[in-house]
From Swiss-Prot:
Enzyme class: transferase
Main location, first listed in the record: cytoplasm
InterPro entries (alphabetical): Aldolase_TIM, Methyltransferase_A, RlmN_N, RNA_MTrfase_RlmN, rRNA_lsu_MTrfase_RlmN/Cfr, rSAM
Residues annotated as the enzyme's active site: 125, 383
Domain Radical SAM core: 131-380
The family this protein is said to belong to: Belongs to the radical SAM superfamily. RlmN family.
Cofactor, free-text remark: Binds 1 [4Fe-4S] cluster. The cluster is coordinated with 3 cysteines and an exchangeable S-adenosyl-L-methionine.
Protein name: Dual-specificity RNA methyltransferase RlmN
Misc. remarks from the entry: Reaction proceeds by a ping-pong mechanism involving intermediate methylation of a conserved cysteine residue.
UniProt key word tRNA processing: yes
Source species: Brucella abortus (strain 2308)
Keyword Thylakoid (UniProt): no
Pfam families associated with the record: Radical_SAM, RlmN_N
Binding site for S-adenosyl-L-methionine: 209-210, 241, 263-265, 340
Length: 411
């Protein structure tokens, strides 16, 4: 990379700083690599092949058990090797642009990732939901989304790109950093977290994006997250939520083996076509068939069906009856989600009395149908509310500019 020095001193400093950052960002991250990929990368960097298996074991422990983000902290690796690793690779965390804490203890982070050689930095949101005895991290798989589900705030942000396995895992690693969930890390004062054990006990792929439109990177990240020699999360505590990418549902069961959740939200094709437009490609009959055939499906490994409660849209008792009929014979749990409002939406949340009637009918038919307690609404961290802050700012700036132009024309 060439640098022009026909600049002021301040400009030169800025350009040199950008050059240094670009060099740093160009280095591949060891986070998110499979063991096979890490072996190839280490050999290419000059690690003797006879040492590779041992070095991978050391690195895996430091990255995923100890949670270090600086090669200098890897104390059982020689100084020369640490220097070589730092020259060729990075294990740095993303920038935490913002952390918001809800009155109910929910935390939302805005993470910024470097461009990695092209384009501009990207931002995504992750949410931590503490409950008694457990803590759930909601992770994003894409920057934006392609699905345009009409009730979902994320769907109003166009897809920018898929996240890499590194960026998916970095959300978990950084959240564990912030919560003191690695050895020798302190929990923030006043943080609402489980009283004993891990701070993050569960992860759900329910953040920004459709995970199954980024299958390979999501697969790699979740297999690392569930690896017994590292982060060691049980696959029964990892849930992948999809709007219904039918071909990849089969692959999810065969190749990843985590718990499955379906963003259902309607029991008639004509309504689901509007609420969840992917239904036009994979209608309900195909989706439900894939669910019935999901590998490992049992009463101990039920599918969760998510159903947002929209006033006078999908919340009638007739809808409840059709829901029970549609899912007949599938080991399932039905999460009823009170609609979380966001600026500009035309939908309203169902009345609480109607939600309870709906739940009572489904429960009486033999399906657990908990009503999800809204969490983090005051920081737009609740289900369906995620959208990167940078996108909101750009939109607000455009609106402000348009208002100024209108005002100018009116003079």
């Amino acid at each position: 990379m060439s640098i022009s020095f026909d600049l002021t001193i301040d400009d030169t400093r800025d350009q040199l700083a950008r050059h240094a950052r670009a060099s740093l960002e160009a280095k591949p991250s060891l986070i998110g690599m499979s063991r096979e990929e890490m072996a190839a990368a280490l050999i290419a960097a000059g690690v003797p092949e006879r040492q590779v298996k041992m070095r991978i074991s050391q690195l895996w422990h430091w990255l995923y058990v100890r949670g270090v983000s600086d090669f200098a902290d890897m104390r059982n690796i020689s100084k020369d090797l640490r220097a070589m690793l730092a020259q060729h690779f990075t294990i740095a965390r993303p920038e935490v642009v913002e952390e918001q804490i809800s009155q109910d203890g929910t935390r939302k982070w805005l993470f910024r990732f470097p461009p990695r050689g092209a384009g501009r930095p990207v931002e995504i949101e992750s949410v931590y939901i503490p409950e008694e005895g457990r803590g759930t991290l909601c992770i994003s798989s894409q920057v934006g989304c392609t699905l345009t589900c009409s009730f979902c705030h994320t769907g109003t942000q166009k897809l920018v790109r898929n996240l890499t396995s590194e960026e998916i895992l970095a959300q978990l690693l950084t959240a564990r950093d912030r919560l003191g969930d690695f050895p020798d890390k302190d929990t923030p004062d006043g943080a609402m977290v489980p009283a004993e054990g891990r701070k993050i006990t569960n992860i759900v792929m329910m953040g920004m994006g459709e995970p199954l439109y980024n299958f390979e990177e999501v697969k790699k990240a979740l297999l690392i997250a569930s690896d017994g020699d590292g982060l060691s999360l049980s696959k029964c505590r990892i849930t992948l939520s999809t709007s219904g990418v039918v071909p990849e549902i089969y692959r999810t069961g065969d190749e990843i083996g985590v718990m499955l959740a379906i963003s259902l939200h309607a029991v008639r094709d004509e309504l689901r076509d509007i609420l969840v437009p992917i239904n036009k490609k994979y209608p309900l009959a195909e989706l439900i068939k894939a669910c019935r055939e999901y590998p490992g499906l049992s009463n101990a490994k039920r599918i969760t069906f998510e159903y947002v409660m929209l006033k006078d849209i999908n919340d009638s008792l007739d809808d409840a009856k059709l829901l029970v009929k549609l899912l007949q014979g599938i080991p399932a749990k039905i999460n009823l989600i009170p609609f979380n409002p966001w600026p500009g939406t035309n939908y309203q949340c169902s009345d609480w009395e109607q939600i309870e009637k709906f739940a009572d009918y489904v429960n009486a038919a033999g399906y657990a149908s908990p009503i999800r307690t809204p969490r983090g609404r005051d920081i737009l961290a609740a289900c369906g509310q995620l959208k990167s802050e940078s996108e909101r700012l750009r939109k607000s700036e455009r609106l402000a500019l348009e208002a100024m132009m209108i005002a100018g024309h009116g003079e």
